[in-house]
Amino acid sequence: MSTSFACTTCTVAFNNAESQKIHWKSDWHHYNLKRKVASLPPLSAEVFAGKILSIQKQNEEVQKKAEFYQNCEVCNKKFYSEGAYSSHMASKKHRDNLSKFQRNSRIKKLQSEDASSIASSTLSMGEPVVDSEIEEEEDLASQLTSRAISLSNLSLHGRESEPSKTELATSIPQSNEASKSHLFTQEPTPEEIEAELARRSSQRLSPRDCLFCAASFSSFDTCKKHMKASHSLYIPEREYLVDEPSLFDYLAEKISIGFTCLTCNREFKSLEAVRAHMQQKGHTSIAYDTEDEQLELSDFYDFTTSYPDYAVKQDETVVEEDGSSGEGDWEDVSDDSDNSSLDSLEMGRVPIADEYELHLPSGNRVGHRSLSRYFRQNLHSSSTAVGDGASIHQNVARRAMSGNARAYRQAVETSIAGVRDGRKNYSASHIKSFQDQRRREEFANKMGIKNNTKKHFRDALLQ
Amino acid sequence: MELDPSDSNSRVVDASQFSKYRDAGALVSKAFHQVASRCVPGASTREISSYGDNLLHEYKSSIYKSQRFEKGIAEPTSICVNNCAYNYAPGPESVIAGNDNSYHLQVGDVTKISMGLHFDGYTALISHTIVVTPPPQPGMGPYIGPGADAICAAHYASKAVANLLATNNSDDPITGSRLRKIVDDIASQFRVSVCPGSRIRRISRFLVGQPTIDRLEEDQNTKHAVEWPAPEEETRKADVTNSLDPANVLSTELNTWHVMPKEAWLIDISMSSQPISSLKEHPDLKPTLYIHDVNVSYMLKLKASRSLLSEIKKEKSVFPFHFGSLSSERNLLGLRELTDRHILVPMPVLISSPSNVIAREELTVITQPNPSSDLLCLTVPTPPSYVKSDFSLEDGTDAALICEGINVNIKSININV
């Protein structure tokens, strides 16, 4: 055997150079070369062929596996293995989704029928139902919105068909559960809000339930005691509270329907959440610091007993019964008017200068600051005049002027005595031209420029 | 209408008030006679008025010493001559560089002396017209001319009104229109006219028609008064009724009040020789009489005005006072501010045209103090000066009958208390 044509790597000999060259290009030779580099013994042709075959078979299997693809439309899931797919198809979840999907697809079919019929009959532009998109969308929220749109369309066009109506009616309760999770992410429709409200008000707290924990009591009073004792609930301005049951009713509503914390007014997603928050943070008090918060609860309070003229009014009614000392009262009232800008006089019929004064329901009078120099003067009461003669004359004057004239005189005496016309005109223009405000602004402006601290706001339109 | 019962009671004079009225009337009459005797040619009006004030001060101090009520001059002595109607009471300000620049009386001056006194607000006012004459000489004739007419008219009118008030009874009540009519009648019979500012009014404690309170009383509707010039609506209504039925005027004219027994009335009637519609303030003479309006209060700025006001409050009541009677000269600086703020109301010297002559009679009377007596004249009626008018009351007229006063019993108080 000649060795002129041989491959040392693969330890094979050839008959001619031609076959040798073909060998050098073969995969077997390349493989053996790699093995040689790795100092491994060369493989024989048979072994190599077997190896190739086995690899090919493996590849085929992998290929076969890779080619598997199943999509579960119902559950919006994709499967690349048969086992996973078969196990999914057998699962309970898939079966649940399947039943839902079947119902929804029926609705969709009906709607699309409706929409197409409307579109064909009215040829209206911009028909909002885009069938293809909606069919692909599995999202329940989008279905709901589309249903709302189609519902409005139906009512708009007045072509409601009986089956669609009943279908909608049955579908709404079922959709509620699904919509719950979307309530805060999607814009809720009125129906949804109503339904949510109805659901929440159904689990609203009764007056006998504790606001802060799950405890329930036999009576409202014991409930109150419990809240005071264990949650240290404090009711602000208790002496003026006139409608306690309504107040607690309102608080219960706020917690169980609004899911809102009583102290920080933060909203939560459930009753449990808000209760947990209140207990953890110790927010078991009623917010009553700011004016807004006080106004919120003002319906349940009555502060008239605290007004300064409340006692006076009662006195007057008492005095008028015996009738003789009614005159004396007048003087007393005007005598103690040391805080002259807030006089507790008989109000409501002082004809003077309405534009300079505010008449508060409490009976106090608030004067405009442009006349403060007059309101602030501490007038000696005219009753300082000594002697019978003076008092007789004052009595005559007081009795002579009834009603408006007397009130006018009182007003003149106590407030703007000596205010001349010029000053009044000044006041009028003062009030009319917002002089106070303007003066403040001008001052702030001047100081801002001087100290280089003036705020400069760029006009958004010019950018 | 709101009426304070205690106040309406005070309109009627009871015994204790009556004695105060009587004392005031007696003392002011006494002072008046002494002042009147001083009115001789060449006398200074400043001296006479200050003399009168001193007398009043002296008299009021001499009585009711232990009582603590207010008492004092209800009207400072004023000497108004000829065409001057009211309030000429020159004080120390008229003395310039030692010269007395006030008016000096001359022969033939028709001089009106008025003064008043009050005890506890019960006031007697008096006013009388005298003609300044030289000491009586044999053969001297009476004062004649327009002035005499006015003097006679004023005299008879005041007398007639007093007589009319004396005849007051419930069957034939005295009403405002009756009083007005008789005065107007007498004025027309003497060819003179009633001077503005004349009045017949009911007075009560501290309320004698001071200008500060007068208007307010009117509002109160408790003022019973006849005033000249007549309020417009009254004359209009009188015209209407006259044109309709002249005979029925008295009964149809608006009469909301009539004279009651035991009331104090002030009769103050001025007659001017020429018809005048209004009096005007003297252009040069500054007012010397002021009245404190207790119904005005104001924060005063000047220290002088504050101290002046406190002095006025302490010393003076609600009656007019002469600013010369205030103690401190310095504080008079504040007078201007007080008048500007209407705390003090000046009583200006009122005059009419120079050719005019005004006569004035003022009486304070109490109607029927006892059921037996008819009328008490608090101020002693002074016999008129020796005057002769060309006119006289026509016989048979109401005015003449009333002035004769045949059945009228007027009692006068004894001047020497």
UniProtKB/Swiss-Prot annotation, chain A:
One of its GO terms (biological process) is nucleocytoplasmic transport. The modification Phosphoserine is found at S150, S155. One of its GO terms (molecular function) is nucleic acid binding. Residues 109-136, 155-189, 317-341, 444-463 are annotated as: Disordered. Gene3D superfamilies: Classic Zinc Finger. It is found in: Cytoplasm. InterPro entries: Matrin/U1-like-C_Znf_C2H2, ZN622/Rei1/Reh1_Znf-C2H2, Znf622/Rei1/Reh1, Znf_C2H2_sf, Znf_C2H2_type. Pfam families: zf-C2H2_2 (PF12756), zf-met (PF12874). The keyword Repeat applies. PROSITE patterns: ZINC_FINGER_C2H2_1, ZINC_FINGER_C2H2_2. Keywords: Cytoplasm, Metal-binding, Phosphoprotein, Repeat, Ribosome biogenesis, Zinc, Zinc-finger. Residues 317-338 have a biased composition (Acidic residues). GO terms for cellular component: cytosol; preribosome, large subunit precursor. The keyword Chaperone does not apply. Coiled coil: none annotated. Residues 113-124, 167-188 have a biased composition (Polar residues). A zinc finger (C2H2-type) spans 5-30, 70-94, 208-231, 259-283. Belongs to the REI1 family. Associates with nascent pre-60S particles that have not yet entered the translating pool, and is released from mature 60S subunits. Pre-60S-associated factor involved in the cytoplasmic maturation of the 60S subunit. Involved in the dissociation and recycling of other late pre-60S factors before newly synthesized large ribosomal subunits enter translation. This is Cytoplasmic 60S subunit biogenesis factor SPCC550.15c. The lineage of its organism: Eukaryota, Fungi, Dikarya, Ascomycota, Taphrinomycotina.
UniProtKB/Swiss-Prot annotation, chain B:
Its EC number is 3.-.-.-. One of its GO terms (biological process) is proteolysis. Keywords: Cytoplasm, Hydrolase, Metal-binding, Metalloprotease, Nucleus, Protease. InterPro entries: Creatinase/aminopeptidase-like, PA2G4/ARX1, Pept_M24, WH-like_DNA-bd_sf, WH_DNA-bd_sf. GO terms for molecular function: metal ion binding; metallopeptidase activity. CDD domains: PA2G4-like. One of its GO terms (cellular component) is nucleus. It is found in: Cytoplasm; Nucleus. It is an enzyme of class 3 (hydrolase). Pfam families: Peptidase_M24. Component of the nucleoplasmic and cytoplasmic pre-60S ribosomal particles. Belongs to the peptidase M24 family. Probable metalloprotease involved in proper assembly of pre-ribosomal particles during the biogenesis of the 60S ribosomal subunit. Accompanies the pre-60S particles to the cytoplasm. This is Probable metalloprotease arx1.
